[in-house]
């Protein structure tokens, strides 16, 4: 799992690459927390287009990131959601 960070001054984009399973989620959250603390974004996008796999641990990462951003006055959006990841989100009831 890798995370590529890009901040354009208006939006922080975090691109997740690889597999987001239990072990990767434990590594990802501190990186995400550090980025949010450093940039204090009003808007953050999790770009999931680089994920090849995600399980329920990935859902926890998304929900924790959303909670963290709300606490700092920011908002979270997802983009580039692969089909397999979309299915996980659908099963969890997190899509429209």
Question: Each predicted region: which residue ranges?
Answer:
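Amphipathic alpha-helical interaction surfaces in cytosolic regulatory modules
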Residues: 19-96
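Short beta-strand/loop segment at the start of cytosolic alpha/beta domains
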Residues: 1-15
């Amino acid at each position: 799992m890798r995370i590529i960070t890009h901040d354009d001054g208006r939006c922080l984009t975090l691109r997740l690459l690889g597999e987001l399973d239990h072990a990767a989620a434990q590594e990802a959250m501190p990186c995400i927390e550090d980025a949010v603390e450093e940039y204090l974004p009003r808007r953050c996008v999790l770009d999931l287009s680089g994920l090849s796999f995600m399980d329920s641990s990935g859902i926890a990462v998304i929900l924790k990131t959303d909670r963290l951003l709300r606490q700092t006055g920011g908002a979270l959006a997802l983009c580039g959601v692969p089909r397999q990841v979309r299915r996980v989100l659908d099963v969890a009831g997190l899509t429209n």
